[in-house]
């Protein structure tokens, strides 16, 4: 049997230590409720701070998730493969070789890629002039495969008049609402699209001279409105085959292949795999952060701003807690003097104050979690209608749906609780030190 040591008077030191600790815990809990009003107000302040932190983080992550999703679906996708140098120059002369497009298609058919891939959209990009009987407008031409584009892009979902492109209507074109307003056209109107033909060396295309101006007659099939000025006033979609014929590009060649993934977090992995597969080809494989650096920078700045604001809120809550606990300590100097006179050591006094703070923090965290998660659940299911904040419509620079949904992860919840708990614990050290250093003569002067 294990032996236990006893002191000279027959007492058990370990048992006394445990009893003393439990007694301090009991006293700390009772002290918390000596001033119920102050306790509840402090718990309310700290709980509201945690709830506000959880709500803001949930809406922040949800907003960023929606912004990224909309950005990539209005833009070049989560991952884009294009000719080397196209990102910097934007030259319509830079096309993906047919063999590269074939290699990409083979790679995308592998089992690992099928699991992460949502859709693929080959695109041919160029600039041109769109004219009607009333006016003309410079536009960005995007040749797409209607079936593929409809599955991944948001533009087919933002039609305000007419319908999106279809395979059985090769002469159809869809244009932005601002383009339609400038050209004074409506559904069914005839427009002429003019652009400069391109041709890669060594290719045989229909009678098209490189650099020659080409034009074609099209009919407005649909009008879309995205809320993004740069898209609505500039972008037009037409069938890929029509764009290839107009530009004198072989059927197998496109400007870029846009990949859309089920999870944004897989972007880097997919990009690395494609870079290995296409290492010898004159192409560049970019994630959305590289193809849309402005969007990535805006999200980064928004993250930083929100962290600063959350830090300010927590600092204000922390100062309030410090003030409350410190006032409690100063009001109880006589009590601490009596405790010291009865033999309570400074360390035990400090432990008692820290125990009070931890008990108060535990109650605050429970309240904050209940309140924060309840409100977050509402925002996650019903969403926050941003139109209530902007009265009418969203600013054209915001790439968001009108309804913002919260996305609060478990890691965010755990980290928030840990941060608030550590903050409250550290704050309690100074009042505890103040109580431990109470001098008996000074404490009795309170009388």
Predicted features along the sequence, with ranges:
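Mechanotransmission and gating elements of multispan inner-membrane complexes involved in transport
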Residues: 197-201, 207-306
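N-terminal Sec/SRP start-transfer signal
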Residues: 2-54, 347, 442-447
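Hydrophobic alpha-helical transmembrane segments of multi-pass inner-membrane transport and secretion
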Residues: 36-63, 300-334, 358-371, 418-426
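Hydrophobic, regular-secondary-structure patches
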Residues: 57-140, 163-169
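Hydrophobic secondary-structure segments that place a key small or acidic residue at a functional site
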Residues: 123-124, 137-144, 159-241
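Transmembrane alpha-helical interface segments in multi-pass membrane proteins
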Residues: 326, 335-380, 415
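Short helix-loop junctions at transmembrane helix boundaries
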Residues: 367-415
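C-terminal membrane-exit region of the final transmembrane helix in multipass inner-membrane proteins
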Residues: 403-447
